[in-house]
Amino acid sequence: RAIETWREPPDFEKIKKNMFQVAKPDVVYGMFIAEALDKKADYADDEGKKFDFGKMCDRDTQNIWGEHTCEPTFSSREYRGYLKFITRKAIDLGVQSFMFGQIYRQESSMRNYAPEIIRDIRNYAKKKGVDVVIGAQTGSITDAKYLALFDYIEGGVGIDGRGDIESGPCLSRKESCWALLWHPVYAGKAKNVLLHLDWTGVTYDDLDVFARMSQKKRAQTLRNLYSYFVSQDMGFLMPYFGVLDRTNGGCFGPKKRFYSPSDAYSCKDEKAITAIFEGK
């Protein structure tokens, strides 16, 4: 998720400059293909043709993520053209991982567009000699054929204040099914499962719950989650940045609405994360 597209099209000149400044070798860059668009975004392709973001919207999702926003739909020819443009530009820069945010919000009810979109990304990457992986936040989708389109599926773990996870396929404290993708009903049909502390900027999400724990409890929780999911042949992604509810009351990063493990801020989880990766 190094390249974020939430409510904002990717600025490839800025991305190129930032990638050039990263000195560490063999870094794998990823692009997050977000389920949120700004209908008034001013953005054009390399020939100067401007995209019409209003045409990309699911008509029933006006202002769903704030003023002038919507959820895009794969059924829009304009949106598919935009996706082709940004994914190809990213591949040209060497981006190797593409993840669709909450793909069930972008897909049609027939789920018949993802195969075409994914095939185009893979074919272009192959033509350019770039190895890519494609993932998605697939929610409660259990269609084995659909899940098999992706190299990985990704979602939150659903922790409580003790750092424990539940046993069911859906988080019990939500009315609709907030899918726990580590559950066999999903994981058993996917090629790979990546898990993280989910964040949406509300007090009951994974990251806010985590940030309210003591430093010792946070370290223990990360170690337990990492050890458990790796033992289940799944990946657990350590929290390096995320959005918090600014009234959360726990530790935070550079501002109250952001989490950071850096020792420069109040959470100071950096050493605990490093120790886990080093097997200490």
Where are the regions a protein language model picked out?
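Glycan-processing catalytic domains of CAZymes
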Residues: R1-K280
